[in-house]
Regions:
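N-terminal Sec-pathway targeting helices
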Residues: 4-32
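Ser/Thr/Pro/Gly-rich low-complexity linker/stalk segments immediately outside membranes or between
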Residues: 33-52
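Extended, small/polar residue-biased N-terminal targeting/export presequences
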Residues: 53, 67-132
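Terminal peptide-recognition signature
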Residues: 57, 99, 137, 170, ...
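STAS-typified acidic loop motif
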Residues: 124-150
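Short acidic catalytic loops
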Residues: 135-138, 156-178, 236-238
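Solvent-exposed loop/turn segments at secondary-structure junctions
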Residues: 141-145, 174-180, 196-197, 203-207, ...
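Gly/Ser/Thr-rich loop/hinge elements
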Residues: 177-235, 271-277, 281
Length: 286
């Protein structure tokens, strides 16, 4: 009996060793993933020195709309050379701000931690009013929390569910952008299900889709639940303030037979951007 048990003990020992190796490899792989991919999600581990930090952010900028060609190659090289001489992370951020203007163009910028919080604190909800049977909904810019986004979208959708509506005015004049997800979900009773708009990111096309009151593919995925569709005339109002996600919302109505657009030309920021939380507490909007 003891002789028969020895092979079993050896097998158990081998299994234990294999499991231990797998655990170590898994931990190492996980650490590598966090280190290599974490910065794209605001996870900076281990704490980077100024040079490593700057290099990683330049890598993120490579996805910028203008991060191709000789101009970006030169700007990137200049930034990298300056970063090598930097002694603090804040000094690196100043260098990165210059590079960001080239990689991302006019629709890119750095936000201080306080400025990012100000956007949340300055949340403005949509409003609505009825004049006879014509409903007007104001669709302001939005850059708040997920909870505020749900409230924003639901407020719009509920207003569009009013009884006896014979026409709708969608007021985008003060919409300076933000998160398109709650905007489009809230206006879903006016939009047909399917592809609402499309985004081209690094040569690949991504469709922003609407299905049963849920928006996906652009901005924060947001749902107001399945709502009845309003088949009424729609007037969309614009101004020179209408920008970014406000312009994307305007584009969602493009080509619909029952829609007319009135107002001044928009600001010309119809590109979309991505937020990257940085190690310094700032947010890079690219």
């Amino acid at each position: 009996l003891p002789r028969r048990a020895r092979p079993r003990r050896r097998v158990l020992k081998i299994v234990a060793i294999v499991l231990a190796v797998l655990v170590v490899l898994g931990a190492a792989a996980g650490a590598w993933l966090v280190h290599s991919m974490g910065p794209a999600f605001g996870i900076w581990w281990p704490a980077p020195n100024p040079q490593s930090y700057g290099s990683r952010v330049l890598d993120l900028m490579d996805s910028g709309i203008h991060a191709t060609g000789q101009e970006w190659a030169q700007a990137r090289a200049d930034a990298a050379a300056r970063i090598e001489k930097a002694t603090t992370h804040d000094e690196v951020d100043a260098i990165l701000t210059d590079a960001l203007a080239v990689a991302g163009g006019k629709h890119s910028f750095m936000l201080d931690a306080g400025e990012a919080q100000d956007l949340v604190d300055s949340y403005i909800a949509p409003t609505s009013s009825m004049d006879g049977c014509v409903l007007t909904v104001t669709v302001p810019g939005f850059a708040g929390t997920a909870e505020q986004g749900e409230e924003y979208a639901t407020t719009l959708a509920d207003a569009l569910g009013a009884e006896g509506v014979c026409g709708v005015v969608v007021d985008l004049r003060d919409n300076d952008g933000g998160d398109m997800g709650p905007m489009l979900a809230g206006l879903s009773p006016l939009l047909p299900d399917g592809t609402v708009t499309s985004l081209v990111i690094q040569g690949a096309t991504t469709d922003v889709t609407l299905k049963d009151g849920a928006i996906s593919g652009g901005g924060t995925p947001t749902s107001v639940g399945a709502r009845g569709k309003l088949d009424v005339p729609v007037a969309v109002l614009t101004s020179s303030t209408t920008a970014s996600s406000g312009e994307q919302t305007l584009l969602a109505f493009r080509g619909l037979d029952n829609v007319r657009v009135f107002g001044a030309p928009t600001r010309g920021y119809a590109s979309v951007n991505q937020e990257y939380p940085l190690y310094t507490g700032r947010t890079m909007v690219l």
